[in-house]
């Protein structure tokens, strides 16, 4: 463990452990796994991002600056793909944009993407937009122009095409436990008494019957978006890993 990482961990360790164990009273082992994973992601973080981290440690409210001018966009609508967006950075700079918020760009199934919010793979860019290498190159160029990069990180649910969902459908209990599965409608009916509907017209109800596994699964958005079960510490840890992987590509802000 480096001195820098140890200093940061010690500063937040007690609060982090307390909060984690409040969520997961029997999760000491999972907490240790989380800490080990965070250290590994720190080790893999490149020197440029580490230098930026140090700078921002000294200016903790950097993201609140009145000098930040943001722009939110869908990559394909603005520039076709990530490479095209990179070519338009000079134009954005001329407009004084220094905070670039990218709408969802991760891999989603065709026809069931919900505008990019039905993620099938958190470590793969939608092929029509480019590759993860393209994203890393874009972030490098953004930072060369003092432009911060933000992304939408969809953490409430995954696509039914996600590996976890596929393995859950195949009957693997470990993966069913990462979602909300029910053998009958008894418990879902209780949820429905108080749980509001996100899309009452286009996708009414919060549960979907899956004939392929003879179970109900919680789907508060669309039937192809399965809610993640954060009562399971494995879900929390794995999603943190996904987030830190993306942050190490040069993402500054996660929404």
What are these regions (language model features)?
Residues 252:
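Receiver (REC) domain switch/active-site residues of two-component response regulators
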Residues 1-232, 236-240, 244, 248:
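Acidic/aromatic-lined carbohydrate-recognition and catalytic surfaces
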């Amino acid at each position: 463990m480096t001195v820098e990482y140890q200093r940061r961990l010690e500063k937040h360790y007690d609060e982090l452990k307390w909060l984690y164990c409040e969520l997961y009273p029997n999760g000491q082992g999972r907490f240790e796994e989380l800490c080990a994973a965070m250290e590994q992601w720190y080790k893999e973080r490149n020197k440029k991002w580490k230098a930026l981290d140090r700078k921002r440690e000294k200016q903790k409210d950097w993201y609140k600056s009145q000098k930040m001018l943001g722009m939110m966009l869908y990559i394909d609508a603005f520039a076709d793909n990530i490479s095209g967006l990179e070519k338009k950075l000079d134009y954005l700079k001329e407009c004084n944009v220094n905070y670039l918020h990218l709408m969802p760009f991760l891999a989603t199934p065709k026809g069931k993407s919900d505008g990019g919010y039905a993620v099938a793979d958190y470590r793969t860019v939608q092929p029509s937009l480019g590759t993860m290498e393209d994203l890393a190159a874009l972030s490098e160029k953004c930072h060369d122009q003092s432009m911060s990069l933000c992304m939408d990180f969809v953490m409430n649910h995954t696509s039914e095409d996600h590996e976890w969902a596929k393995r859950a459908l195949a009957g693997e209990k470990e993966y069913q436990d990462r979602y909300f599965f029910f053998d009958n409608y008894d418990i879902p009916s209780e949820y429905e008494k108080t749980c509001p509907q996100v899309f009452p017209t286009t996708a009414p109800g919060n549960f979907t019957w899956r004939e392929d596994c003879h179970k109900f699964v919680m789907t508060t958005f669309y039937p192809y978006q399965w809610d993640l079960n954060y009562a399971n510490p494995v879900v929390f840890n794995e999603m943190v890993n996904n987030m830190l992987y993306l942050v190490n590509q040069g993402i500054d802000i996660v929404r």
